């Protein structure tokens, strides 16, 4: 039985989220958005990462926004979000003195360090301008390459506004 739909918004181009959300709801399965390439992209006027039950964003060194490595997980279910917070740091809640810890789950070390977080936070002030430049460059290439014989630009869904993390074309 299918447990989840995992959709990748490749190169910053949003997938057809209306259809995927419909299928997930119809069959009672989870929709997970891989937004690693799509920070700043929108679908039907809404930000990528807001359609799924879960969304994953990458802040790896060459993405729109970087923390050198790392990323962020978002989810709709507050109960699962609390559990995810515990699992990210050895099964322990952050900020609780060790003498008062009640470790009920085995965890991992998936938390971001403070230096990486500061690197990311320092970019938030200008992230919209950076993404806007990627979009302007993508549209420029779309317009120029569309007139070159032998090349085909990526078709963009009417509801999609890509963030053009990388540029793709067909030959």
Where are these regions (language model features)?
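PLP-dependent aminotransferase class I/II
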Residues: 4-8, 13-19, 26, 42, ...
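Active-site phosphate-binding strand-loop segment of PLP-dependent enzymes
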Residues: 1-67, 72-74, 78-79
């Amino acid at each position: 039985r299918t447990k989840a739909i995992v959709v990748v918004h490749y190169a910053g181009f949003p997938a057809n989220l209306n259809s995927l959300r419909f299928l997930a709801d119809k069959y009672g399965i989870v929709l997970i958005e891989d937004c690693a390439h799509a920070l700043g992209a929108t679908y039907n006027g809404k930000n990528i990462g807001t359609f799924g039950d879960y969304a994953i964003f990458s802040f790896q060194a060459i993405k729109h926004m970087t923390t050198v490595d790392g990323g962020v997980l978002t989810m709709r279910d507050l109960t699962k979000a609390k559990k995810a917070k515990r699992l990210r740091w050895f099964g322990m809640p952050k900020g609780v003195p060790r003498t008062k810890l009640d470790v009920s789950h085995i965890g991992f070390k998936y938390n971001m360090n403070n230096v990486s977080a500061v690197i990311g936070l320092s970019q938030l002030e200008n992230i919209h301008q950076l993404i806007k430049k990627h979009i302007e460059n993508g549209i420029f290439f779309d317009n120029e390459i569309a007139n070159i014989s032998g090349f085909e630009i990526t078709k963009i869904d009417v509801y999609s506004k890509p963030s053009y993390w990388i540029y793709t074309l067909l030959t």
